[in-house]
């Protein structure tokens, strides 16, 4: 089933409603990080170039649903877009019963979460949104895993529902990485808990040639290999699960390597003293905060020979420089690799920024939860809706 792409449609004189992910941090009425806004601009500009009357909607923050709260208003986003597009952009507050929008004009709807029924994918709300447009464009990969009125319901009732360029690009990149990857395929999965990424680990262990674990997740695997992890964050109840994942990987000719050396400290703080130890020398009072240089080099070698790399999560507490060397080395290896690489997840993107490798990663995914669910092999509600409408 093919998804209709906005770029293939004739939008001349059409009312086009675009769902973007414009959920950006705002301080004192000013946008403080504009990455998502910048990513959405080409879609808005393309709709204008195609002669459309453009309406844009998004959520911002987590207001109480159904209640207006100026703290979560889209006004700062409107101000930003007006500057970026060098043309007036209007904020529409009461838009559900109809909104005037001319060809060549951009109107931004007030926060969709101010509408009662948004999160529950309310049918009546979805139909009201759908009645506002000739074409609905889903372009928000970051919210594609949520079945809500503005991301899913509206698309079921709009005359035409299609994918925007940003969403299409994201699905193509993820498809390239997961559906028919160049081998060997390496996945690096970090983060604090095995429990939150268990389904990702299970799904990836079935398709990758090499699964690399880092962060708190690695501590559970270190414990599963019979080593002391001291006071480190780990999940004792998931040790058997970790052993099963290792056995699965090995049965396919792969592995989930455990660090041979680690960086430890006695406390979790920006000023904690880092000590390098062999993984077999970790004491009861130690906390593991990073992989050591030998382990980092071994992982860098695995990355060097990869054909496809999926990176989700740092391998240490890189926010503190003394525990960032492992993640820095991994980032460098990915940057130097000729493989198709895709990185996603908030902490991962922070590491990509910190070590300045954004232009060396083949594709940076804008979605956090959606990226994870895609890796888990789940069909995202927004994608299912677009396939249904494209059939």
Curated annotation (Swiss-Prot):
Q: What is its EC number?
A: 2.7.2.3
Q: Quote the subunit structure annotation.
A: Monomer.
List locations, semicolon-separated.
Cytoplasm
- Which coarse location class applies to the principal site listed for this UniProt protein? cytoplasm
Q: What class of enzyme is it?
A: transferase
- This protein's name: Phosphoglycerate kinase
Q: Which GO terms describe its molecular function?
A: ADP binding; ATP binding; phosphoglycerate kinase activity
Q: Is Nucleotide-binding set as a keyword in this record?
A: yes
Q: What Gene3D superfamilies has UniProt attached to this entry?
A: Phosphoglycerate kinase, N-terminal domain
**Source domain of life:** Bacteria
* Keyword presence, Kinase: yes
Name the positions where ATP binds: 197, 319, 345-348
| Keyword terms | ATP-binding, Cytoplasm, Glycolysis, Kinase, Nucleotide-binding, Transferase
User: So where does substrate get bound?
Assistant: 21-23, 36, 59-62, 113, 146
List, alphabetically, the GO terms of the cellular component aspect.
cytosol
Q: Where does this protein act, in terms of pathway?
A: Carbohydrate degradation; glycolysis; pyruvate from D-glyceraldehyde 3-phosphate: step 2/5
- State the species of origin: Shewanella putrefaciens (strain CN-32 / ATCC BAA-453)
InterPro entries the UniProt entry points to: Phosphoglycerate_kinase, Phosphoglycerate_kinase_CS, Phosphoglycerate_kinase_N, Phosphoglycerate_kinase_sf
Q: Which reaction does it catalyse?
A: (2R)-3-phosphoglycerate + ATP = (2R)-3-phospho-glyceroyl phosphate + ADP
Q: Which biological processes are named by the entry's GO terms?
A: gluconeogenesis; glycolytic process
Family per UniProt?
Belongs to the phosphoglycerate kinase family.
